[in-house]
């Protein structure tokens, strides 16, 4: 038998490599993948998986080790508040230090927080440690937006953020599944310890990939567009004054929508386990349903939003935010809770488009600080929603869900009236 029936000839091998190379180039172009964005995606995957191994179970863990409903609400409020407070300094440090150095510093601070919670199994350790371990997700948010903005063309921003959002959801799906198995297998106390140990290892791997992120050519920009005012002398109020009218209206509607999300956020796991009779592992399945739903939306919606406009998709995502607490009212078993979490996944339908709107409205020389200021104002305001949620939950779970839905409806109407109609 002829040998060439088993092996390709050299010219045929070259053609095969050409076809594969063209496919990979086309795929990377469609998905808006560049060196920095690709390295960032790996970092987000590793850091996010480590965090989600245990953080989503923290409210039940606090309850297990003796924390009250108020402590659960306080911990949830700290997540929101620190996410807000850290956003602006995260943007400032990114503008000042550059993307790589800032990300490495944020990872180091987060690891210190994980070590504290691992060494001291007490609800107070979670409250104190949150000031440290939330550094990655909170401080790095403006940095991740800046990486997209500096690496991609303007008309590719939604796809860049969409891919980033897609990758962020992989840990949100895998983390609770693995974490739920650890908690079911080893119990709440030991299970959280094992999850934290894995989290620390993955955070160290994250830093290794961040080391290779390169700085964009305009990193050393020191003055604003009129070349008279040093960029770093611009105050927080000056950054806020630079907000366009569209960005301000988006901020108001976003605040109302985040109240809708925050009010029931910490208590959904209590509803599922205490009222729905689910195990920790079954709750992990619910989160997986949510993440799969969100992931299926990101790429096609990002492509359509870049092509046809972002505002209709933002309006749709606000509607799904509002529907989630409504569906929880009837969700008292696994099947109905699964449906509710699919609706929760659909709330990510237009999130990349919303973030791309922020990118589009931000001045390039103030980009990271604009993101930080936006999230500082939004999340500082919304942090009170955790206490409101705890108070409503103490009345009844139904009061909590209805209050959330009212906020969502108001936010959706605001966006439609002030932004969507004016496109």
Describe each region flagged by the PLM.
Residues 22-82, 246-286:
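Helix-loop boundary and gating motifs at the non-cytosolic
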Residues 74-91, 288-300:
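Central cavity-lining transmembrane alpha-helices of secondary-active solute carriers
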Residues 200-223, 414-419:
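C-terminal membrane-cytosol helix-exit motif in multi-pass small-molecule transporters
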Residues 85-121, 305-311:
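Conserved MFS/SLC helix-loop-helix module at the cytosolic interface between two early adjacent transmembrane helices
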Residues 108-122, 319-332:
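C-terminal ends and interior cores of transmembrane alpha-helices
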Residues 131-168, 357:
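Cytoplasmic helix-loop-helix junction between adjacent transmembrane helices
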Residues 60, 64, 174-193, 270, ...:
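Transmembrane alpha-helix termini and helix-breaking/packing motifs in multi-pass membrane transporters
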Residues 7-34, 216-253:
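Juxtamembrane intracellular "pre-TM" segments in multi-pass secondary transporters
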């Amino acid at each position: 038998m002829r040998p060439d029936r088993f092996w390709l000839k050299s010219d045929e091998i070259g053609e095969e490599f050409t076809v594969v190379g063209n496919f990979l180039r086309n795929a990377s172009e469609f998905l808006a993948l560049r060196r920095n964005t690709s390295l960032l995606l790996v970092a987000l995957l590793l850091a996010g998986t480590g965090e989600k191994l245990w953080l989503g179970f923290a409210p039940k863990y606090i309850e297990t080790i003796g924390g009250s409903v108020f402590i659960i609400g306080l911990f949830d409020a700290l997540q929101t508040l620190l996410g807000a407070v850290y956003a602006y300094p995260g943007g400032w440090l990114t503008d000042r230090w550059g993307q790589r150095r800032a990300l490495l510093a944020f990872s180091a601070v987060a690891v210190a927080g994980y070590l504290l919670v691992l060494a001291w199994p007490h609800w107070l350790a979670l409250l104190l440690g949150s000031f440290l371990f939330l550094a990655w997700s909170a401080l790095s948010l403006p940095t991740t937006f800046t990486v997209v903005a500096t690496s991609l063309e303007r008309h590719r921003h939604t796809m860049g953020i969409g891919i980033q959002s897609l990758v962020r959801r992989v840990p949100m799906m895998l983390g609770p599944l693995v974490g739920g198995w650890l908690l079911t297998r080893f119990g709440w106390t030991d299970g959280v310890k094992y999850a934290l140990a894995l989290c620390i290892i993955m955070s160290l791997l994250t830093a290794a990939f961040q080391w290779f992120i390169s700085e964009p050519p305009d990193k050393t920009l020191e003055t604003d567009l009129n070349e008279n005012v040093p960029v770093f002398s611009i105050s927080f109020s000056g950054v806020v004054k630079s907000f366009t009218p569209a960005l301000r209206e988006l901020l108001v509607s976003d605040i109302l929508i985040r109240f809708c999300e925050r009010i029931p956020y910490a208590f959904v796991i209590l509803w599922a386990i205490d009222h729905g009779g689910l195990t920790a592992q079954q709750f992990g399945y619910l989160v997986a349903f949510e993440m799969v739903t969100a992931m299926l939306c990101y790429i096609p919606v990002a492509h359509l939003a870049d092509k046809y406009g972002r505002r209709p998709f933002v309006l749709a995502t606000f509607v799904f935010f509002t529907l989630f607490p409504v569906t929880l009212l009837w969700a008292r078993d696994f099947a109905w809770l699964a449906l509710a979490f699919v609706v929760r996944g659909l709330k990510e339908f237009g999130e990349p488009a919303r973030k791309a709107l922020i990118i589009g409205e931000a001045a390039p020389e103030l980009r990271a600080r604009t993101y930080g200021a936006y999230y500082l104002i939004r999340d500082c305001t919304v942090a009170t929603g955790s206490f409101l949620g705890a108070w409503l939950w103490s009345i009844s779970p139904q009061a909590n869900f209805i209050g959330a839905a009212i906020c969502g409806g108001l936010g959706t109407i605001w966006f439609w009236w002030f932004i969507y109609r004016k496109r």
